[in-house]
């Protein structure tokens, strides 16, 4: 089931504001890169499509779990003669790029888990890591996503290494990700409901 939550609704433990029946919904994940959801939904008579707005949250089953949250970043403009609406969304952990600001965070001689705990202290986010090597990094005036694996130095990945998975409000950074994640997840509407299709192209490139 694919659900959508209004941007003001943060009660993700319960059902969303509406159930969606997209023509296509694709979740793609690149190792230590971009995770993105692309969705095409019909302009339906029931008006479900009207819930598809920027900042709304889509809940979909993926290789990470039955209910993974993605924040809509942008939607297509709908004209009167259009038959569908498209949306692009990113993992809800990516919200930390806007609301988790590291003014002066200095994990010193810490293992991966300890460093991430310091970086996320006092926030709604959490982390999991099996990285046992110790390292040091000073993060001053950086947002969490940039400090994790952004373009500026230093980043967590530069200092501690590891491979990243996103699980709602939790980030997992292990030496190597484990499990059968190397697949793109697709959903299409058919006569019986939502069909899941698996593609091995253009996704996580190495999984052990």
Give the location of each predicted region.
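Amphipathic, non-transmembrane alpha-helical segments in extracytoplasmic/periplasmic proteins
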Residues: 30, 38-39, 89, 102-128, ...
């Amino acid at each position: 089931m694919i659900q959508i939550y209004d941007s003001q609704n943060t009660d993700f433990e319960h059902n969303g504001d509406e159930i969606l029946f997209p023509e296509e919904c694709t979740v793609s994940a690149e190792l230590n890169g971009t995770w993105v959801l692309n969705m095409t939904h019909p302009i339906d008579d029931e008006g479900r499509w009207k819930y598809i707005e920027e900042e709304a949250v889509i809940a979909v089953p993926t290789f990470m779990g039955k209910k993974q949250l993605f924040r809509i970043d942008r939607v297509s403009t709908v004209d009167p003669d259009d038959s569908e609406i498209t949306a692009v969304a990113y993992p809800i952990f990516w919200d930390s790029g806007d609301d988790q600001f590291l003014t002066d965070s200095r994990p010193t001689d810490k293992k991966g888990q300890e460093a991430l705990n310091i970086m996320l202290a006092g926030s709604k986010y959490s982390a999991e890591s099996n990285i046992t090597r110790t390292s040091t990094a000073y993060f001053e005036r950086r947002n969490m996503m940039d400090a994790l694996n952004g373009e500026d130095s230093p980043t967590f990945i530069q200092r501690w290494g590891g491979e990243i998975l996103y699980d709602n409000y939790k980030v997992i950074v292990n030496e190597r990700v484990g499990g059968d994640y190397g697949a793109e997840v697709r959903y299409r509407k058919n006569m019986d409901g939502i069909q899941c299709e698996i593609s091995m192209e253009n996704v996580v490139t190495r999984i052990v």
